[in-house]
Design a protein with these regions (language model features):
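Conserved short beta-strand elements that form part of the metal-binding/catalytic scaffold
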Residues: 28-62, 109-114
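Conserved acetyl-CoA-binding loop of GNAT-fold acetyltransferases
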Residues: 23-30, 83-85
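N-terminal beta-strand motif that seeds the catalytic metal site of vicinal oxygen chelate
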Residues: 1-19, 64-65, 113-117
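Vicinal oxygen chelate
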Residues: 13-15, 65-109
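Conserved catalytic-core motifs of GNAT/GCN5-like acyltransferases
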Residues: 9, 28-34, 91-93, 117
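Exposed loop/turn and edge beta-strand positions of beta-sandwich/beta-sheet ligand-binding modules
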Residues: 4, 61, 96
Length: 117
């Protein structure tokens, strides 16, 4: 029986740029860093990992990592204050979450959410 997700690993063409992005969002590095080939961030009780890939390696898939945050609007304000953009402001969804989406520098879609009520 599956208990939980331990980690999500995303590829990056520029580790320094990706590390800067995720640190600006408040992710804490637990391994690696801007000069590494592999970096791991704490994401609650799980981990978000980055693995460096050569620029000639391309990916053409779609997926989304969803992270629960304590305050969606405050998190969004921090994203904007750090110079990043989201296609739309946080909103309440019919499935019972407040959320917004953000795309990282390598094109990975992220969602930051919180259950309503």
């Amino acid at each position: 029986m599956i208990e939980t997700i331990s980690a999500i690993t995303l590829a990056t063409h520029d580790m320094a740029r990706a590390v800067h992005f995720y640190e600006a969002l408040g992710f804490e590095i637990v391994h690696g860093g801007k000069d590494g080939l592999f970096t791991s961030f704490r994401a609650g009780t799980c981990y978000l990992n980055l693995i460096a890939q050569s620029v000639d390696r391309h990916w053409s898939w779609w997926g989304r990592a969803i992270f629960y945050v304590s305050d969606v609007d405050a998190f969004y304000a921090n994203v904007i204050a750090n110079g990043y953009r989201s296609d739309e402001a946080p909103r309440d969804a019919e499935w019972g979450e407040r959320f917004f989406h953000l795309t990282d520098p390598d094109g990975h879609e992220l969602s930051f959410a919180r259950p309503l009520g």
